[in-house]
Amino acid sequence: MQRTCVLIVLIVTSTMWTPDPDVYAQPRGFNYDEAQVPKYTLPDPLVMVDGTKVTSAKQWNDKRRDEVQQLFEAYMYGKVPDGETELIFTDAKGERALGGAAIRKQVKISFGEKEDAPAMDLLIYLPADAKVRVPVFLGLNFHGNHTIHKDKEIWLTESWVRTNKKFGITKNKANELSRGVAAGRWQIEKAIAKGYGVATIYCGDIDPDFNFPSNGIQAYYYKKDQTIPEKGQWGTIAAWAFGLSCAMDYFETDTDIDHKKVAVLGHSRLGKTSLWAGAIDTRFALTISNCSGCGGAALSRRRFGETVRRINTSFPHWFCSRFHQYNDKEDKLPIDQHMLIALCAPRPVLINSATEDKWADPHGEFLAAQGADAVYRMLGTGGLDAKKWPEPNKLVKSTIGYHLRPGKHDVTARDWDVYIEFADHHMTGGAE
């Protein structure tokens, strides 16, 4: 889908994530034993569908890369509809925030001029006294922009939000009780101190995370009389990734942001999203996946932890409908997740896992990173500089990076230390 952009400037003066129970509980009845992983053969990312071997960077760039992307679009994530979208940026003037350490911007991005056009709110924090354009970490959040910090000026989302009594969220509506509940997962001050900006969008602004085909951005692009996505059309993860690319469109208009140095990141289902966004939108300089598991960085053929059948049963809207035909038939897939990582090549990618997060198969995430190595090396990078699964807390800083954090399915301050160290090494040379 082609996008054109219109910027509207308004001068404004100012007078979470919910842990998914079936992720945290490591559900019974699934394999968590490495000895029980079935034998499998991964598709070779350097062999075309017709059997032709890819032996040069030119072949990869001219033919195989597009072929792999089309396979993922056709059989897994779905394809964004053809056509053009005119994005409307309503830009709130930046204001001092976080005790003067940051500039806060809030931008409403509308997907067209029609009154019923959907819109998403982009929240941005930038170092207040930056002398040059700022590199940025961009990611989606689970429960609204207001949950990532206690900053009282962050807009409350008007979109549907999953009810969560622990966070004070009732009747699927955001309120003040949930302000800052996910702040631990968004180390804003840490990133600002290191010279980075942080930007986020509530995923539900783009497409609410439940199986109802007539809501969200997808329905806005239906053809006349269409009520559900067609067989190979985008699922929710692809819609979320589209939203991230639209945020990048905005960054290209903002002279405070270095749009050549944007890292796209995400956790869990939003880590699946960041990988897909980084794979298909080459404007992202760096891609970070945090505990993304099945449908993200973990190899489907291992059937370790969450499986294709389980994810399609629990979340039938995340992927295109064709992906469902591979329930219990992972070996018949023409793709696996090492090929998704390979689509990011030669740009750096970081796979961040957690030792206790067996549902997301941290070892399978590492093996997928290994499986992408040959593509990266063909394109002239160092690939993955690890022959075996690294010990916890050891950051592998090669172009394909890997880190295994002790602990559970989460995003922690330690994870942000790793993100920043990896970005310093590959994207900025040290942003400070």
From Swiss-Prot:
Gene3D superfamilies: alpha/beta hydrolase (3.40.50.1820). Displays some glucuronoyl esterase activity in vitro, since it is able to hydrolyze methyl 4-O-methyl-D-glucopyranosyluronate, allyl D-glucuronate, benzyl D-glucuronate and D-glucuronic acid methyl ester. However, esters of glucuronic acid are probably not its biological substrate, as they are not present in the marine environment. Can also hydrolyze a range of other esters, including p-nitrophenyl acetate. GO terms for biological process: polysaccharide catabolic process. Belongs to the carbohydrate esterase 15 (CE15) family. One of its GO terms (molecular function) is carboxylic ester hydrolase activity. Its main location: periplasm. Optimum pH is 8.0. Shows more than 60% of its maximum activity in the pH range of 7.0-9.5. 20% of the activity is retained at low pH range and at pH 10.5, while no catalytic activity is found at pH 5.0 or 10.5. It comes from Unknown prokaryotic organism. This is Carbohydrate esterase MZ0003. The lineage of its organism: Bacteria, environmental samples.
